[in-house]
Amino acid sequence: MKPLASVTRLSAVAGTTILVDRVDFTIWPGQVTALVGASGSGKTTSALALLGEHGAGVNLTGRVEVDEQIVVDDNGPRAAASVRGRVVAYMPQHPGSALNPARRIGAGLRELAKLHRPGEEVVQEALRAAQLPGDRATLRRFPHQFSGGQRQRIALAQALTCGPKILVLDEPSTGLDSVTRLQLVSELEDLAQQGLGILLLSHDLELVRALAKQVVVLSAGRVTEAGGTEVLPAATEISPTVGTMRAAEPLLQAMNVSASLRTRGREPILHEVDLAVLPGGCVGVVGRSGSGKTTLARCLAGLHERHTGRITLAGKELPVLRKRSAEQVRRVQYVWQEVRGSFDERRRVDEQVARTAQRLRGLNREKAHAEAVATLARLGVSAMVAARPPSQLSGGELQRAALARALLAQPDVLVCDEITTALDDDGTALVVDLLHELKQDRGTALVWISHDLGLVAAVSDHVLVLDAGRVVEQGPPATVMTEPATELTRRLVRAARVGQEPPPVTSCADTRSEPRR
């Protein structure tokens, strides 16, 4: 059996910085090869070399052969247009970079099918494989009308529409709830059995253990381990961080909040949600992709203006963002999942992080920069890395920079929407430890939105479960996770660990029960 792709002594250098140093790996038909490592370890740079692609200012050397074509040699990349899509399809970590915001998803999928494999059945097949409905209503929606997890699956459908021999998946479980993640494992196993070669880039060690035949562990651009799944590092345990609340009165409160995409003529996407966060407390919000978690976060941040009900901060009404005072903006900060688009590609990351302290707290440039560098270092982003433009940072590094940017406002409330999805266990532990310190020392209140039920249980003192925009269950995390009262929560808990039998693919929206109080 011939390999579909072989990478030999691949190196990537940007100026004097070595991004990848003599990396070797092979992709075989019907097998999953995994590249594993911390943010910035060289996973994405190595994978993009299969397409002959690289970041600005990066020089590639070594040998990359794909489908018996030389894509990279010691003189750098060669013409690789013939392998893109037809042989190698790449699904990026951040689906926003793969989706045209001005095109309905159906039109985009049909265009790809026309280029590679004409036929409407190709589009429907790709949607089914990506766990998405193929009805007209779905195909006519724009990318911004889907949740982050749903956009991830749309990007996967785009890659599958091309009918490639090799599928490169960069953090494919990012933003997926536990049920959909388990279904993804089953579908990728089926694709591999059909002969597709899969290159999996992931810090999700459970996903890698469930799928990979070969594992390559990267650290600082070098291969440190290679072999079967036995070479994977042990997971870092996140210790529970729930502390003592400081007061009985909520700091942030949402009362009877409903939201819709349009002012009239559209079913609400959030239905009469109540939420209260105490100083130093943390409310976790969980649910399947598209359940309304991000819409709730955007309402709290003032970004989603089409909502009804009341949102208060320390008992005072909070208007929408454009009507908030600078002090209100400072006190409530929002960090969302897809952060790359929020950074200016022309400016250094540390300067953009520091700007928050200058604008919202009045610090001078020198003090703001020193605080930015110190906060970034606490989160595992070195001063050397932070001095680069955003395009030269990995997804995990940029995610931590976005958190640091919000923290420099010294907020009273921090709304965190999937802020650890691009991080490995060690990076997640750094984030959790710093936020726990802020809760204890400053009384910072957190709203923590995540698909990682174990992490939610570790950081939260109260959990809301959303389904189809409604709170279907709530209570202490120990109770909700161990004695779930609704079928949805039971399915989420059962699916939280990869390797169990997948539950039925039927909609959860019809399994509602009264919320636990």
Question: For each of these PLM feature ranges, what is it?
Answer:
Residues V71-A89, L115, Q193, E267, ...:
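ABC ATPase NBD coupling module
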Residues L51, A301:
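Helix-to-loop junction immediately C-terminal to a conserved catalytic motif
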Residues F142-F146, Q150, P389-L393, E397:
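Conserved ABC ATPase signature
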Residues A226-G227, Q474-G475:
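ABC ATPase "signature
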Residues N59-V72, E225, G309-E317:
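Conserved ABC transporter NBD signature motif
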Residues G163, Q410:
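Conserved catalytic motifs of ABC-family nucleotide-binding domains
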